Amino acid sequence: MNGAYRGALSRLLSKPFFLPLLSGLLLGISFPTWPAVHLEPLAWIALVPLLLSLEHEERFGPFFRKSWMSMLLFCLIALWWVCLATFVGGILTVFVQSLFSVVPLVVFYYFKKRAGFRSALLALPFIWTGWEWAYMQQDFSLGWLTFGNSQANLLWMVQYADVTGVWGVSFWLLTFNVLVLLLFMEKESFQVKVGIVMVMLVMIATPLLYARQVFRNTALDNTSPKVRVALVQPDIDPHEKWDGLGPEETLSRLYSLTGQSVRGERLELIIWPETAIPFYIRLPENKPYMDSVRRMVMRWNTPLLTGFPDEVPVFPNSARGEAVAASGAEYAAYNASMLLHPAGGPVQIYRKMRLVPFGERVPYSEYFPWLERLSFSMSGISSWAKGREATVMHFTSRDGQPVRMANIICYESIFPGQVSTFVRRGAQFLTLVTNDGWYGTSYGPWQHAAIDRLRCIENRRAMARCANTGVTLFYDICGRSYAETPWWQQSVLTADVPLESRITFYTAHPDLVPHVCLGIAGVLALVAAVRKR
């Protein structure tokens, strides 16, 4: 029996795509899914089978096919749920993301050919981490599958992100994978094996010790001022919201839920989710609805932050998103949020700056308008224009103190550099509005919520996360959830949010780690170019 088992295993291992697909499987399931599933440690070894299969692959064609098959399976497992919102768009997302994920492995192939496999392994963490950052600087980036995001729910292992950001977590994981492979490959020196094991143990212990100190300091420091915030989860089907409900019924639901939340509470901020108001409420013909919202804010005597589609006039032939005809003028449409004060005054508006590729906007369509034909509309939502300013909103607390906050709209929380910009501009806490109802009961919304933890840790800012159908919750500065609503239920969640003013090392230097990695990778590439193998 044992012989038959070993024979079957040997035949399986001899299949050219078994090890690459095994890596793709391990990578895919290591990313956050539902709350009860914790397979994050698999990411610490997930790349080993793929790299092992590439050791003796000298021709680029087979090398690329193995790498791409691995990344394709990885992306399919981690991102299949995107197809629930738009099937064709989801397939395109998985395909494009897998191609971009292969890029660091193509560079690894160059190093391998010039400097040998072991030298290329040592360069891989620098190559991969630098590429992850570079990839996120352009509009095609989904940014979801940054390697470090796999550890988002493993809070004891990622607290050092306040120093390195998620980039440091990626580098840490990649280095550990390389060490595991080097340990497997070492056949001669017992001392070398012991040395590698010792380094691996240090790499496990260091984040744990750092986290222990962070949690201890957080428990001791309970002096931060707080604001009382209510999160309204209306639980409206997103397709129904855009295609079925009228303005009166939509606002009526929101008013009813919000009215319940203000009874007996000294609230200082009310938050409605992304596009909670699903029509162009600032257009002149919708002024009665805008006046209605203002009256309710005055009645509640509490500032209101809400998502809504905004529109501004644009000049002919200017770069813009979808044009909306109104009173003979031309408008650019934005996915936006606004803050209204009970005392009246100007509305504070933030317009979403990072848009979902192909779902909300076709990348670079402002330069090539014909690309608009490639958009995949979700109930008519597509072709938003890009916001240009990271606006920090402000209001006054009950005790008269000024409060500054960031508002992140949905997918933007995937971009660490953008969130840190809000904090450098003075945001004392983070708010996030989202509508993850497009993805049903898949683990997509939970994956999104998990990644949001990292933004809290990196900047040491609490987050009030308001979702249309869930996941609605509050995170503290360590990424721990301390209040949460049931999923797919109408509800209101109220809690105190701590305000912070300190700036972490990461917030002050958000691009330091990837820049260093790119610099070292560049130097190693020059060395490899002139080195004889």
From Swiss-Prot:
SUPFAM superfamilies associated with the record: Carbon-nitrogen hydrolase
Annotated signal sequence range: none
Domain CN hydrolase, first and last residues per copy: 232-499
Single GO molecular function: N-acyltransferase activity
Compartments (UniProt record): Cell inner membrane
One Gene Ontology term, aspect cellular component: plasma membrane
Topology versus the membrane: Multi-pass membrane protein
Family matches, as InterPro entries: Apolipo_AcylTrfase (IPR004563), C-N_Hydrolase (IPR003010), C-N_Hydrolase_sf (IPR036526), LNT_N (IPR045378)
Pfam families the record matches: CN_hydrolase, LNT_N
Pathway: Protein modification; lipoprotein biosynthesis (N-acyl transfer)
CDD domains assigned: ALP_N-acyl_transferase
Alphabetical GO biological process terms: lipoprotein biosynthetic process
Source species, domain of life: Bacteria
Protein purpose: Catalyzes the phospholipid dependent N-acylation of the N-terminal cysteine of apolipoprotein, the last step in lipoprotein maturation.
Family: Belongs to the CN hydrolase family. Apolipoprotein N-acyltransferase subfamily.
Protein name per Swiss-Prot or TrEMBL: Apolipoprotein N-acyltransferase
Species whose genome carries this gene: Chlorobaculum tepidum (strain ATCC 49652 / DSM 12025 / NBRC 103806 / TLS)
Upper lineage: Bacteria, Pseudomonadati, Chlorobiota, Chlorobiia, Chlorobiales
